[in-house]
From Swiss-Prot:
Catalytic residue list: 235
Family designation: Belongs to the TER reductase family.
Designated name of the protein: Enoyl-[acyl-carrier-protein] reductase [NADH]
Quaternary state and interactors: Monomer.
Annotated organism of origin: Burkholderia mallei (strain NCTC 10229)
Superkingdom field: Bacteria
UniProt GO molecular function: enoyl-[acyl-carrier-protein] reductase (NADH) activity; NAD binding; trans-2-enoyl-CoA reductase (NADH) activity
Function: Involved in the final reduction of the elongation cycle of fatty acid synthesis (FAS II). Catalyzes the reduction of a carbon-carbon double bond in an enoyl moiety that is covalently linked to an acyl carrier protein (ACP).
GO BP terms in the entry: fatty acid biosynthetic process
Pathway: Lipid metabolism; fatty acid biosynthesis
EC number: 1.3.1.9
Positions of the record's site feature: Plays an important role in discriminating NADH against NADPH: 75
Length: 397
């Protein structure tokens, strides 16, 4: 079938298998050009491994180090001529490329928040890897059903204490709009922490440790985004910020646990990129469009694979990691360059419907958004029929 992009709001409801595969190959090629990652991990578990930063971590570990990988994700398979999700096709392509190079790859498809998927993952580690020496936690989800209580918690994107008016882009109509966000209630804050805080990461590490599948010296990291002044009302001072502070508290306990066996636990702060999650946040399309414009002009623009490849080389497996005062690993240094942030802030209120395409890189933002779903990738013939029914080998469901 011939597959074209169909966008509704912040979701593209179609995906292109060949485009997703080409995107994965592009990321692999980038890692290969950078050369081997010295002293990297050998057996890696990535929780949230099918898109964005999690996929980039799996690619960097496998093709930069030669690591065996086990990926956990929650994706929809193709069925009845309906394409699967982008993460499904990304993972299928990853498996194909890993197999071609003789790299061990296993995947588990299901709800990472559940005890069932944790148990299946532990069984797969025992069978295929024995133990893991790196656990990457890269889960982005709007809701979580707690495995112990059965309660489903829904996260919210709201300020705390007062309403906030945010500028943004109505991406459907390509117009500047303002959104008034009301403050989160205490229950909404607690629910957001339950979904996006550190509890599930801790549950994973506790379960892996109790099962004896964490190697001595194992490291774990959880990916997060903090941002700067423009985004602080939402990301640090809002309901999501409370979840991020919970992540900071959680990592201290995990670090103590792993340090006793020569290991480490860190929160890794990465730069803002286009993801399905970030595109749903009212201000982020405008912020990202401005950030792309400014960073591309300075030749410092990076995507997921550049960020995570650099994180492994320069911090996670470096003798001189980039660490902030709270002990977080920082890969967002170029985004937070004072000159970059000052320019973004200067342009923020100048953007109008008429100059959207000149003051910002909204065109680049839209292109990156479509790339998430396999569209707009160089070398792919989008007028040619493509087979949507792609399977993932070594998949546990």
């Amino acid at each position: 079938m011939i597959i074209k992009p169909r966008v509704r709001g912040f979701i593209c409801v179609t995906t292109h298998p060949a485009g997703c595969a080409a995107s994965v190959r592009e990321q692999i090629a980038y890692v290969a050009r950078r050369g081997p990652i010295e002293r990297g991990p050998k057996k890696v578990l990535v929780i949230g491994a099918s898109t964005g930063y999690g996929l980039a971590a799996r690619i960097a570990a496998a093709f930069g180090v030669g690591a065996a990988t086990l990926g956990v994700f929650f994706e929809r398979a193709p069925a009845d001529a309906k394409p699967g999700t982008a993460g499904w096709y990304n993972s299928a392509a990853f498996h194909d490329e890993a197999a071609a190079r003789g790299l061990q790859a296993t995947s588990v498809n299901g709800d990472a928040f559940s005890d069932e998927i944790k148990h299946k993952t532990i069984d797969a580690i025992r069978r295929d890897l024995g133990q893991v020496d790196l656990v990457v936690y890269s889960v982005a989800a709007p809701r979580r059903t707690h495995p112990k209580t059965g309660v489903t918690h829904q996260s919210t994107l709201k300020p705390i204490g007062h309403a906030v008016r945010l500028r943004g882009i109505d991406t459907d109509n390509e117009a500047i709009k303002e959104t008034l966000l009301q403050p989160a209630t205490p229950d909404e804050i607690a629910d957001t922490v339950a979904v996006m805080g550190g509890e599930d990461w801790r549950m994973w590490i506790d379960a892996l440790d109790a099962a004896g599948v964490l190697a001595d010296g194992a490291k774990t990291t959880a990916f997060t985004y903090l941002g700067e002044q423009v985004t602080h009302d939402i990301y640090w001072n809002g309901s999501i910020g409370e979840a991020k502070k919970d992540l900071d508290r959680t990592v201290l306990a995990l670090r103590g646990k792993l340090a006793a066996r020569g290991g480490d636990a860190r929160v890794s702060v990465l730069k803002a990129v286009v993801t399905q999650a970030s595109s749903a946040i009212p201000m982020m399309p405008l912020y990202l469009s401005l950030l792309f414009k400014v960073m591309k002009a300075r030749s410092t623009h990076e995507g997921c694979i550049e960020q995570v490849d650099g994180l492994l080389r320069d911090s996670l497996y470096s003798a001189q990691p980039h660490v902030d005062a709270e002990g977080r690993l920082r890969a967002d240094r170029l985004e937070l360059d004072p000159a970059v942030q000052a320019r973004v802030l200067e342009l923020w209120d100048q953007v109008t419907d008429d100059n959207l395409y000149t003051l910002t890189d909204f065109a680049g933002y839209k292109a990156e958004f479509l790339r998430l779903f396999g569209f707009g990738i160089d070398g792919v013939d989008y007028d040619a029929p493509v087979e949507p029914n792609v399977r993932i080998p070594n998949l546990i469901e």
